[in-house]
């Protein structure tokens, strides 16, 4: 038995302007090469574009988009005997949000277009409406989990 104590889970900090943890999680995932100020710029421009397009609270659109993309279940590769099975596992809320943010950024980077702020705002609006590549990725993951339900007992 380990003598080392358990560590407390870190709480996500909130961003300086909106005081929102989701925005901060998004900033930390979009971050490249340590340029956090550029990441903040991209996010804030995307939020401003959402505000201009919808004329509603952009944070509610962001929450709705992330809620729509968050998966309930995913598959994990598990080696049993000599073969590898895709085992469906339930996902917690924090891990689900992290996956949703990762998929939203992946989908927005994949989009053709001018700059990242424009692409991210478009993807967030699509996800809030229930369409877009990030939503498709979630549905594909759910389909994979449903197809491999027979291996659920390998958890």
Curated annotation (Swiss-Prot):
Keywords: Chloroplast, Plastid, Ribonucleoprotein, Ribosomal protein, RNA-binding, rRNA-binding
Gene3D superfamilies attached to this UniProt entry: Ribosomal protein S7 domain
Any GO CC annotation of this UniProt entry: chloroplast
SUPFAM superfamilies: Ribosomal protein S7 (SSF47973)
Coiled coil: none
CDD domains: uS7_Chloroplast
A Pfam family it matches: Ribosomal_S7
Molecular-function GO terms, alphabetical: rRNA binding; structural constituent of ribosome
PROSITE patterns hit by this protein: RIBOSOMAL_S7
Single Gene Ontology BP annotation: translation
Localization per Swiss-Prot or TrEMBL: Plastid, Chloroplast
Signal peptide: none
InterPro entries (UniProt xref): Ribosomal_uS7, Ribosomal_uS7_bac/org-type, Ribosomal_uS7_CS, Ribosomal_uS7_dom, Ribosomal_uS7_dom_sf
PANTHER family: RIBOSOMAL PROTEIN S7 (PTHR11205)
Subunit field text: Part of the 30S ribosomal subunit.
Family of this protein: Belongs to the universal ribosomal protein uS7 family.
Role, per record: One of the primary rRNA binding proteins, it binds directly to 16S rRNA where it nucleates assembly of the head domain of the 30S subunit.
Name of the protein in its database record: Small ribosomal subunit protein uS7c
Lineage: Eukaryota, Viridiplantae, Streptophyta, Embryophyta, Tracheophyta
Gene that encodes the chain: rps7
């Amino acid at each position: 038995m380990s003598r080392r104590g358990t560590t407390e889970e870190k709480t996500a900090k909130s961003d300086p302007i909106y005081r929102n943890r989701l925005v901060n999680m998004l900033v930390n995932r979009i971050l490249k090469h340590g340029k956090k100020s550029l990441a903040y710029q991209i996010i804030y421009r995307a939020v401003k574009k959402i505000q201009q397009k919808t004329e509603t609270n952009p944070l509610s659109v962001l929450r709705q988009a992330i809620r729509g993309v968050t998966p309930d279940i995913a598959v994990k590769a598990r080696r049993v005997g000599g073969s590898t099975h895709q085992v469906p596992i339930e996902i917690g809320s924090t891990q689900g949000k992290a996956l949703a943010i990762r998929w939203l950024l992946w989908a927005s980077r994949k989009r053709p277009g001018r700059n990242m702020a424009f692409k991210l705002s478009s993807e967030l609006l699509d996800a809030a409406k229930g369409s877009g590549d990030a939503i498709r990725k979630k549905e594909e993951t759910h389909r994979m989990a449903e197809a491999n339900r027979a291996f659920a007992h390998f958890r």
